[in-house]
């Protein structure tokens, strides 16, 4: 398949995923959560044990991709899922390995096959102690917005609830268009269930989905496994492992936790040259496909203006994004 045909096929995939998000919203009056979790104030879960000691995330973990299965003709998989039970339940082990074609970009030179979940040391990992937790792959990811708010951060009150909904007041100074010390947000995050009325920048001006080739790191349609770590498959000056939320989510920057060698917050659009497991990454020549909240698909050149990309990644900051 030629590059142009692969790009068109990919655009069709991500368009169908975007339309499925809209169908989900019509059925439920909100978009699916980026992923579902039951964090608590003291870092404990009902058993009294913190599954993820950094983010305090717990079960069930199901991500946006798992929730739209009935809308992408994958109802046979969805019917076997208990969305209130953990991803890693024994009853789910075969289902979560499913290779679902719409989640796979034909341009990705990385694996299409399911992958083994790993921990910080890259050893096989599962919260229940099993070492064979294998997840179906996705080359498409949901937009978390500008910040990488998927764990307690310096300056927070260190309570798990702070990232359950739209984030609390910013603790770091980041400036875009003169707006200092803000935490920007996108439509997908822990327990988000964003209502369309909250996308005040407009669904036609807000990035919902993008690409992430498995050449860079492993992503899944299934969801988030608390305590897992996403590792890069090649290194760069800014690249390193990141938390389990990046199994399904990416962000645009700027994020106060990610600074370049000059100390300036990084914005990383599609194919940003230093790479990052929590960014959009495509193998199409020159850029990658993104899907906006209205289901429209756009090919973003990898040289897109950084501020424009960041502005399109937030859903309710009131920016007027530039040309793209």
Predicted regions span which residues?
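Short, surface-exposed recognition loops and adjoining beta-strand edges that mediate ligand/DNA contacts
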Residues: 34-43, 55-58, 79-131
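Generic structural signal for secondary-structure transition and capping sites
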Residues: 26-29, 76-77, 110, 204, ...
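Alpha-helical scaffolds flanking conserved acidic
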Residues: 14, 98-100, 203
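Hydrophobic alpha-helical interface faces used for helix-helix packing
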Residues: 87, 109, 121-130, 134, ...
């Amino acid at each position: 398949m030629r590059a142009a045909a692969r790009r068109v096929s990919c655009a069709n995939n991500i368009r169908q995923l975007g339309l499925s998000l809209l169908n989900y919203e019509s059925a439920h009056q909100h978009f699916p959560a980026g992923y579902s979790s039951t964090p608590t104030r003291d870092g404990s879960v009902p058993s009294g044990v913190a599954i993820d000691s950094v983010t305090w995330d717990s079960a069930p973990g199901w991500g946006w991709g798992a929730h739209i299965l009935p809308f992408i003709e994958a109802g046979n998989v969805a019917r076997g899922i208990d969305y209130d039970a953990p991803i890693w339940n024994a009853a789910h082990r075969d289902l979560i390995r499913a290779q679902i074609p719409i989640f796979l970009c034909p341009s990705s030179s990385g694996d299409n096959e399911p992958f083994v979940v790993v921990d910080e040391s890259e050893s096989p990992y599962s919260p229940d102690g099993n070492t064979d937790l294998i997840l179906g792959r996705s080359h498409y990811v949901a937009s978390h917005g500008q910040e990488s708010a998927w764990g307690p951060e310096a300056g927070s009150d260190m309570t798990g609830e702070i990232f359950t909904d739209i984030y609390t007041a910013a603790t770091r100074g980041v400036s875009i268009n003169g707006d200092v010390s803000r935490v920007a947000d996108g439509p997908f995050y822990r327990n988000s269930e964003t209502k369309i009325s909250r996308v005040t920048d407009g669904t036609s001006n807000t990035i919902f989905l993008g690409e992430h080739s498995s050449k860079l790191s492993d992503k899944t349609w299934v969801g988030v496994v608390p305590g897992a770590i996403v590792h890069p498959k090649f290194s760069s000056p800014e690249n390193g492992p990141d938390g389990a939320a990046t199994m399904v989510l990416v962000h645009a920057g700027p994020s106060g936790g990610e600074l370049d060698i000059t100390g300036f917050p990084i914005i990383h659009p599609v194919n940003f040259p230093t790479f990052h497991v929590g960014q959009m990454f495509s193998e199409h020549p020159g850029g990658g496909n993104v899907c906006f909240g209205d289901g429209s698909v756009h090919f973003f050149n990898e040289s897109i203006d950084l501020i424009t990309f960041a502005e399109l990644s937030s859903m309710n900051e009131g920016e007027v994004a530039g040309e793209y």
